[in-house]
Amino acid sequence: MSDQPVHTSELRPVLPFAFARAQQILLLQDESASAAEVVCVPETPALALLEVRRVAGVALTVSQVSPEEFERQLVMRYQRDSEEARRLMEDIGNDIDFYTLAEELPDSDDLLDGEDDAPIIRLINAMLTEAIKHKASDIHIETFERHLLIRFRIDGVLREILRPQRQLASLLVSRIKVMAKLDIAEKRVPQDGRMALRIGGRAIDVRVSTLPSNYGERVVLRLLDKNSVRLDLETLGMAEHHRRQLDTLIHRPHGIILVTGPTASGKSTTLYAALSPLNSAERNIMTVEDPIEYELEGIGQTQVNPKVDMTFARGLRAILRQDPDVVLVGEIRDGETAQIAVQASLTGHLVLSTLHTNSALGALSRLQDMGIEPFLLSTSLLGVLAQRLVRTLCPSCRQPYTIDHEQAEQTGLAAGTTLYHPGGCEKCNYSGYRGRTGIHELLLIDDTVRAAIHRGESELGIARMLGAKRVTIRQDGLDKVLAGITTWEEVVRVTKEE
């Protein structure tokens, strides 16, 4: 048995990926099919070798390697060949039915009955196409004891899409892992990867996350449709007075502007939109992000990489030696990053970043918990924008109604006020909602707030001091409810902590 790599760079894998992996045998042929080589392990079944000889139809050179070397070559060969798979996906187009494909795939764990991997590739393409059509942000592929479950996150809410045969699980996961350049042999630990695709002429960036579970790996695909995002402040659904105030803040020469909110509340999109009007030849704008979600022309973007100790803090330090005017830090996660960001803002830089807090005032406490002294915070902070995303009513089918006394008490509105609730039609896939918009609270650090921070006022104390001048996220949401943009139930769903 030889453990040496087989040097056959001009040869391509011929067998379906699932069959090659299950039987531990690689058949490599050139384009003319005049030369063929087999790579296998000592345990490869004799019947599999006989079948491969029949498929090849030419004399074979057989090399036996160790299981470890076989896995290495399997991954290398099919990762390289996955570029062909991507081209196949692009060529298929949109005239395929995801649900029909899932039902028609062979009832097999290895697609041995198929001539190639095209059916599973078509299924993945159809799944991605369906997700893009419904503007899904994530695809969840989950394996249970008796079935496979595929769910899409649409407008922030998970919806069950399909329960195909459980046998598809290993095929689907394995092919996705190959396309994302993950280790297909490793099923014991989580893995993260990405792939860039074009579907129906759209550039789609797909982040792939796998996680071991009771009945096999579960996969989540995060979809970034680069064609569907307009990165400017006008498209964020912000109230006009909030937009004007934020626009004033981002044109200040130095200081810190923060965007707060839970995961998936649109913080990164808001930061990108804030950079858009600043992006000019006269400014050096640099970012450190995890991950880089959108590539911005004319802006220097750096990816965090913990494997080589490239943290937010280290990246920020390096950026400050690059003569920046504006700095975007994807997230302030620790005291070290917070300290560097504050010092940068005090030395003539405009710094934009995010924090995981529930409210704008909560950012003040969070930064002080990270070790930022009140006198430094009051000097450096310009403003804090807190935000959530709510589903917007489908304008084609929303239904008016008048609120009763119970809802009048909940909302603070007069009984008999006309609001809207979701209907359901073909345009919104019968959900009643179509798209999302932001609801916001903007805390401006004016002289009064600055003095309160400096003397160590509590979060509650500053809230009382602001009184009616403070427009909370829930109040901003209520304005959108009155305008017929969303529902009171949506606002309550995303602001339960208020």
Curated annotation (Swiss-Prot):
EC number per UniProt: 7.4.2.8
Keyword list, A-Z: ATP-binding, Cell inner membrane, Cell membrane, Membrane, Metal-binding, Nucleotide-binding, Protein transport, Translocase, Transport, Zinc
Primary location group: membrane
GO CC terms in record: plasma membrane; type II protein secretion system complex
Binding site for Zn(2+): 394, 397, 425, 428
One GO term (biological process): protein secretion by the type II secretion system
Top EC class for this record: translocase
A single GO molecular function term of this UniProt record: protein-exporting ATPase activity
CDD domains xrefs: PulE-GspE-like
Catalytic activities: ATP + H2O + cellular proteinSide 1 = ADP + phosphate + cellular proteinSide 2
Compartments, as annotated in UniProt: Cell inner membrane
Cofactor names: Zn(2+)
Physiological role: ATPase component of the type II secretion system required for the energy-dependent secretion of extracellular factors such as proteases and toxins from the periplasm. Acts as a molecular motor to provide the energy that is required for assembly of the pseudopilus and the extrusion of substrates generated in the cytoplasm.
Binding partners and assembly: Forms homooligomers; most probably hexamers. Interacts with OutL/GspL. Forms an inner membrane platform subcomplex with OutF/GspF, OutL/GspL and OutM/GspM.
Family: Belongs to the GSP E family.
Alphabetical list of PANTHER family matching this protein: BACTERIOPHAGE ADSORPTION PROTEIN B-RELATED (PTHR30258:SF27), TYPE II SECRETION SYSTEM PROTEIN GSPE-RELATED (PTHR30258)
Official protein name in the record: Type II secretion system protein E
Organism, as annotated: Dickeya chrysanthemi (Pectobacterium chrysanthemi)
